Amino acid sequence: MKRSALLIAAVPVVATAVYLSVPGGSDGAAVGGGPAVSASPHAGELAKERAESESAEDDRLVASRPPGLAAPAKKELAQQILASAENSTLRWRETYGVIEDAGDGDGYTAGIVGFCTGTHDLLALVEGYTEDHPGNGLAGYLPALREVDGTDSHEGLDPGFTDAWRAEAEVPAFRAAQEAERDRVYFEPAVRMAKLDGLGTLGQFVYYDAMVAHGPDTSPAGFYGIREQAVRKAGTPGGGGGEEAYLEAFLEVRRAAVLARDAGADTSRIDTAQRRFLREGNLELSAPLTWQVYGETFRIP
């Protein structure tokens, strides 16, 4: 997860007229009997709570949707597209042991979704893994990981942490822990929120990729802050809006958030990947797929 979700803006998103999809049957019925659209001054926080918690009504709504990105073949496709942006490969299972400092202020970035020492998710991963597997090869670095959390510092991590990470990445239990943390923090909340918003498979991937890159945060540059701004521009399909118009608005807000942090940033994972799929009308994210990220072309037949 990149620091944009945590540090671009420390203030919460607050607006006088923002919108959040709520289950059908509430005041203000939506088009076609789906979720309605409701005004809220804290839509980002409410959306985050809704995506990360369980309610019987939301569970029924999500269960009524097609599997979408949660279908095994589509989930595999999602990991491949994500890996093309995170690690310039489609072979995402070869990236458990990847670790580097990209010089972006996030400290070390590692593993299958780019867990970062500076953005808390790598610390949370190692803490959870150590609870289940005490004495693992990364456990001794927990004090240092806690100290550097929120910074780009390597203090207490060098020189051995990168080698320890690569070694632990050969352990099946740590690979499973990375996948479980990916699903818990990023994949499952993103897909759930997308289904509550009435989005199809492409929209679910758009949410997932943004959740990984921007973090599950409600600041203007975090996932829920980006979603909130997009909903103000174009209502969600679940609230009666058009799916393509909403996704275009979401991607535009996300692109602006990236450029607000770094005006020279490469936005190709948005422009020549997700936007390409959208403008081709591929709302179900069906193969064959061709896209470009960071100047490299990828294809899935």
Language model regions located:
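Donor-sugar nucleotide-binding helix/loop cap in glycosyltransferases
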Residues: F174
